[in-house]
Amino acid sequence: YYDFLSLKTNVSESRKEKARWALVIGDVMGKGIPAGLLMTMLRGMLRAEVLTGLPPDRILHDLNQLAINDLDQSHRFVTLFYSDFDPRTKKLRYSNAAHNPPLLWKNAEQKIIKLDTEGFVLGLQKDAQYNCCEIKLQDNDLILYYTDGVIDSSNALGERFDEDKLIKVLSKLCKQSYSSQEILNKIFKKLDDFTGQNRHLEDDASIVVFQLR
């Protein structure tokens, strides 16, 4: 699951004003219709919660409070990474509920850092607390959001396309100044080549690429 949400809550605001955006990626434990229904429910809760304008850590805290009974009854949990970006200040705030940390390519420094912060999965602990971090982005910085289906994919020898492999592939592509769409396509091509064209991914593999221009 991934989503993009406009955080402009005042309908009278000028259309020319740049609104903040929320970028979210998450994964529910399990597969099939029950997991899909839970994620749909959570998506609705999240879309209502973001309109409060609260910081990411409070968003995750409140979302956990809202969803914990349904998740507990289904014996499932959810990992979720929530971030919001302000194009006026170029600042990204983020909070993590035990999801795979997105990879940030810092173009000026030619290196990748992980956007990680402590936080418990949604649905297991009612009083779970979350941290909020903030980072300022620069032009041509790029963030790769992904689900664990990417790095848990394996080839015929049982080798995993792990986080280290993903970082190496992303770093090489970013250094060649590809567009965000080209990077997305080439990563999936690398994944197909690694697992074999006829092999099915063991879990859903979702990737979102956000590039600042």
Please report, for each region that a protein language model flagged, where it lies by residue:
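Amphipathic alpha-helical coiled-coil segments that mediate homodimerization
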Residues: 1, 59-66, 183, 187
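DG-centered beta-turn motif at the end of beta-strands
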Residues: 27, 99, 147-149, 204
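Active-site-proximal, acidic helix/loop segment immediately C-terminal to a metal-coordinating Asp/Glu
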Residues: 33-53, 113, 137-198, 202
